[in-house]
């Protein structure tokens, strides 16, 4: 099964020592018209390879910073463009979960995402929100979110 790490956006609200995200002044997010082309390619592949599935892992930056409309549109394209192949599209998401809310959860659930990958580091200074790596602020947000 091909697995695609789909970097929906370069934007991220965290500042973690181990991350390879480059914090740009103007981070890019995939345009919705290009997202449509991606789903057309997914469908073409799945039609050509009827025994295959595609796993798509929404990643980033922070995937939630791409905005809820991106995922609503992806869900729409899954239903419309991939109508006959959608059962072989498997989605996952890797997030720092600090921006997760019920709207994201509802859309992700409809996409078949039932587990959200994240990492948690209790060691101070490894992870933080904003430019300063303040783990206390991050951990507070992390636990309030859930």
PLM-predicted stretches and their roles:
Residues 12, 16, 58, 93:
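Conserved, mostly hydrophobic/aromatic
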Residues 39, 43-44, 48-57, 66-146:
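Radical SAM/AdoMet-radical enzyme domain recognition
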Residues 3-33:
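Canonical Radical SAM [4Fe-4S] cluster-binding loop centered on the CxxxCxxC motif
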Residues 1-5, 48-51:
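N-terminal [4Fe-4S]-dependent radical SAM core
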């Amino acid at each position: 099964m091909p697995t695609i790490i789909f970097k929906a956006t370069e934007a991220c609200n965290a500042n973690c020592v181990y991350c390879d995200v480059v914090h740009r002044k103007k981070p890019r997010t995939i345009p919705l018209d290009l997202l449509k082309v991606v789903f057309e390619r997914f469908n073409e592949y799945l039609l050509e390879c009827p025994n295959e599935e595609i796993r798509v892992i929404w990643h980033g930056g922070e995937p939630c910073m791409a905005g809820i409309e991106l995922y609503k549109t992806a869900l729409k394209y899954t239903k419309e463009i991939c109508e006959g192949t959608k059962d072989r599209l498997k989605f996952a998401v890797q997030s720092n979960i600090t921006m997760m809310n019920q709207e994201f959860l509802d859309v992700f659930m409809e996409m078949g995402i039932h587990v959200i990958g994240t990492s948690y580091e209790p060691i101070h200074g490894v992870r933080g929100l904003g430019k300063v790596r303040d783990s206390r602020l991050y951990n507070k947000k992390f636990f309030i979110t859930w």
